C-alpha cells in the first residue's frame, strides 16, 4: 500500500503541474465529470521540503518569458479588429502586462470536495532541478511537459475543473478578443511622445544661443573707433603738449597766494584778554559777531538757562543770541549772561524795557557790555593816552 500511495501522489502532482502549464500557455482544458479522488493531507509535509529558496525567482522568470512569448505570438493574429481599442481596453491591462506567480491551489474556488482544498503544489521549475531524496517504492521522475507536448494529459488530471477567469494569471486570457489590443496603444503612444520631446529640445535650446553671439559681435564697430582715436592722438600730440605745460604752473600759483591771504586774517582773530596784570586768550568770544550790540544781564537765578533768556528777548526783531555763563567744572550758572542785537535801536529798547523785569524767579539787571575794554589792543591804547596826558 505504501508503494501504491506514492505512485498515486506523484501522478496527482504531475496532473496538477500539467494543468498549470496549460493554463499558463493558454491551452483549453476540458473539465471531466469524474469526481476527484480524495487524498489524505498527511502527504503534504513529505513533498514540501523539495522547495528551495530560489524557487520563487525561477518561477517568476519562466512565467515572464512565457508571457512575453505569448504576447508576441498573439499580437499579429488580431490586427484586423479595431473596435476593441475603445474604452473597454484599459481595465484588462494590468493582468496582461504583469503576470504574477500564484499557486494553482490558491487560484481555484473553494468547493465541498476534499481534493480542491488540499494545498499540495509543486512549481514547474522544480522539474529541471536535480532529483531529491526518494522513497524506495517511488518510480523515477519524468518531465511533465511530455503530457501536453506529445499527447493528451493522463485521465487523472481531467477531474480538476479550470479556475474562473478572474483567478487566472496574465497569459490565459490571451485568446480572448478584447485583451490582445492593450500592447498596441502603449507601443503607439510611446513613439508619439518621444519625437515631440526630441523636436522641441533643439528648437528651444539651439536657436537662442546661436543668435545672441551673432548680434553681439555685429553691434560693436571696433574699427572706426580705433581710427578716430588714432586721429585725435595724432592731432593732439603735436601742438597740445607745449601749450599745456605753461598753463599748469600759472593756475597752481594763484590758489597758493589766496591761501596765504586767507591765512593772515585767521591769525588776527585771536581774542587776547588782559585784567589784573595777566593776559589770556578767550576762544568763547569767537562765537559772537564782532559788530553786534551786547547787553550784560546780571542777577540771574540758577534755573535760568539759554532758552529762558532767549525767550525773554526774542520779541525784538534784530535779536541774535543769548547765553548764560556757567562754571566748567560744576555746570552751575555764575549768575550772569549776555544778549546781542544787530540793530542799535532794539538794543536801546531792550535795555530800557527789560531792566528790572522778572526772568525766572528774580528781577534781571541790565547794562552795556564792556567786553571790548578787556581786549589787549584796547588796554594798550588807553595806557598810551594816559601817558600822553601825564596821568601816570
Curated annotation (Swiss-Prot):
One of the Pfam families matching this protein, by short name: RRM_1
GO MF terms held by the record: mRNA binding
Keyword Transcription: no
SUPFAM superfamilies linked: RNA-binding domain, RBD
Similarity annotation: Belongs to the RRM RBM42 family.
Protein name: RNA-binding protein 42
InterPro entries for this protein: Nucleotide-bd_a/b_plait_sf, RBD_domain_sf, RBM42_RBP45_47-like, RBM42_RRM, RRM_dom
GO cellular component, one term: cytoplasm
Signal peptide interval: none
Every RRM domain range: 293-371
UniProt keyword Nucleus, yes or no: yes
Superkingdom of origin: Eukaryota
Function: May bind RNA.
High-level lineage: Eukaryota, Metazoa, Chordata, Craniata, Vertebrata
Subcellular location: Nucleus; Cytoplasm
PROSITE patterns in the cross-refs: RRM
Keywords from the UniProt entry: Cytoplasm, Nucleus, RNA-binding
Amino acid at each position: 500500500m505504501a508503494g501504491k500511495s506514492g505512485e498515486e501522489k506523484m501522478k496527482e502532482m504531475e496532473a496538477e503541474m500539467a494543468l498549470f502549464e496549460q493554463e499558463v500557455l493558454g491551452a483549453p482544458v476540458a473539465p471531466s465529470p469524474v469526481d476527484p479522488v480524495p487524498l489524505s493531507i498527511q502527504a503534504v509535509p513529505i513533498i514540501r521540503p523539495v522547495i528551495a529558496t530560489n524557487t520563487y525567482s525561477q518561477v517568476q522568470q519562466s512565467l515572464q518569458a512565457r508571457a512575453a512569448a505569448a504576447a508576441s505570438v498573439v499580437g499579429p493574429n488580431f490586427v484586423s479588429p479595431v473596435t476593441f481599442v475603445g474604452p473597454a481596453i484599459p481595465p484588462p491591462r494590468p493582468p496582461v502586462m504583469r503576470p504574477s506567480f500564484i499557486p494553482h491551489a490558491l487560484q481555484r474556488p473553494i468547493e465541498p470536495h476534499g481534493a480542491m482544498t488540499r494545498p499540495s503544489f509543486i512549481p514547474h521549475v522544480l522539474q529541471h532541478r536535480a532529483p531529491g531524496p526518494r522513497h524506495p517504492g517511488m518510480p523515477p521522475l519524468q518531465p511533465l511537459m511530455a503530457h501536453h507536448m506529445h499527447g493528451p494529459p493522463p485521465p487523472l488530471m481531467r477531474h480538476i475543473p479550470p479556475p474562473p477567469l478572474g483567478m487566472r494569471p496574465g497569459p490565459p486570457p490571451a485568446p480572448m478578443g478584447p485583451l490582445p489590443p492593450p500592447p498596441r496603444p502603449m507601443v503607439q503612444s510611446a513613439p508619439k511622445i518621444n519625437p515631440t520631446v526630441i523636436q522641441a529640445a533643439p528648437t528651444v535650446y539651439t536657436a537662442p544661443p546661436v543668435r545672441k553671439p551673432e548680434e553681439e559681435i555685429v553691434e560693436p564697430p571696433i574699427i572706426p573707433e580705433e581710427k578716430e582715436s588714432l586721429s585725435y592722438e595724432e592731432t593732439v600730440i603735436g601742438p597740445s603738449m607745449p601749450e599745456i605745460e605753461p598753463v599748469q604752473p600759472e593756475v597752481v600759483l594763484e590758489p597758493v597766494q589766496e591761501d596765504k591771504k586767507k591765512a593772515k586774517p585767521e591769525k588776527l582773530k585771536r581774542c587776547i584778554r588782559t585784567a589784573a596784570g595777566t593776559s589770556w586768550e578767550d576762544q568763547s568770544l569767537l562765537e559772537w559777531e564782532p559788530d553786534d550790540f551786547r547787553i550784560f544781564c546780571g542777577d540771574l537765578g540758577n534755573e535760568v538757562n539759554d532758552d529762558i533768556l532767549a525767550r525773554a528777548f526774542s520779541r525784538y526783531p534784530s535779536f541774535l543770541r543769548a547765553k548764560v555763563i556757567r562754571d566748567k567744572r560744576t555746570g552751575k550758572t555764575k549768575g550772569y549772561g549776555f544778549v546781542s542785537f544787530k540793530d542799535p535801536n532794539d538794543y536801546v529798547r531792550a535795555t530800557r524795557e527789560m531792566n528790572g523785569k522778572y526772568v525766572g524767579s528774580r528781577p534781571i539787571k541790565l547794562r552795556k557790555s564792556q567786553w571790548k575794554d578787556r581786549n589787549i589792543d584796547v588796554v594798550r591804547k588807553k595806557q598810551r593816552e594816559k601817558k600822553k596826558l601825564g596821568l601816570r
